Amino acid sequence: MKKVSVIIFIVIMLGIGCLNLNESIKETCPRTSNITQAMSCYIPEDFEILKGVAEEIPGGTIEWKIWNILEWEEDHLSYDNNKGSDIILKPSEFIKVGEGVCTDYAVLTAGLLLASNISPVYLMIFHFMEDPTLHAAVAVNISGKLFILDQRLPPKNLDSYLIQFSKLEGKIILFAEMYKVEMKKGRVVVSGRKYLDLSNFGFYPGNISLDMLENLLLSEFQRRTNLFPRIDLKTVLPQGLKERKVWMIKFENFKLFYDDTFVEQYSNFIADEILKNEKIKSDISRYSAFWISIKLEGDDLIVRLFLGR
């Protein structure tokens, strides 16, 4: 049994000066460090560019579109730890230079969502205990549940997002400002600021249906490899086969971030990660049967791939 990869989901944090809410909003659309002004001015100005990018990002459902937007940002953008200005980049500028901070990501992400006809979205501004630096991200509401989109996969429900900072980053979020951002007759309207007290927010893991995830993963793996599924490979070398091999893949902190809302996307993600391993790919070409089992060990997801021939 061999461990072949470790996947850690961590949101990159902002640098000092990432967010400025104190600049007054003017009637024109100047360069600005005020994120609400940037949302309302930059997005309409760059909307055709945003629409062109959004049309290239696949997504037959809202879940797939959101997932693929974050994946696109991972592939094309990176965090700028040395940005010397708090002026927010226009989406077209951010796409061109490929580096930005949390406010740049938030404006671009909101723009891509709105250009994908996902509206409203929500601007989230997080305030931390004992840290004056603020952090901006975007959220969407799916079936009454708020998911935070923050630069990288996966989308996280609010519980998961809070525990990420407290457990993995050592930072406590005290409260958040929440603004509605929506398209109205070609304009981007930012409205409805409200405050969410998160200081005593309890952590409740996202919905986890291991059976559903395992079944989707089995189907996806069979589709990609054309291997024959054999459930008895879990325990024995089945009759008619001469060799059995087991691979183990660990996804760290999976329980903290997983939610069944994105079960289809997670099953595809796990299959992708397994098949990125060249040794596993080589084995698959030499074996004829497979099975996959998954289980949680603490917060980690353990995936076992059984191969037979």
From Swiss-Prot:
The record's annotation in InterPro entries points to:
Papain-like_cys_pep_sf (IPR038765), Transglutaminase-like_domain (IPR007562)
Superkingdom is Archaea
Q: Where mainly found? A: membrane
Where does this protein come from, organism-wise? Pyrococcus horikoshii (strain ATCC 700860 / DSM 12428 / JCM 9974 / NBRC 100139 / OT-3)
Say if the entry is tagged with keyword Transmembrane. Answer: yes
Q: Which parts of the chain span the membrane according to its record?
A: 5-25, 106-126
**Name of the protein in its database record:** UPF0252 protein PH0672
Give the SUPFAM superfamilies listed for this entry: Cysteine proteinases
> Which terms are listed as keywords in the entry?
Cell membrane, Membrane, Transmembrane, Transmembrane helix
- Family membership: Belongs to the UPF0252 family.
Compartments reported by the entry: Cell membrane
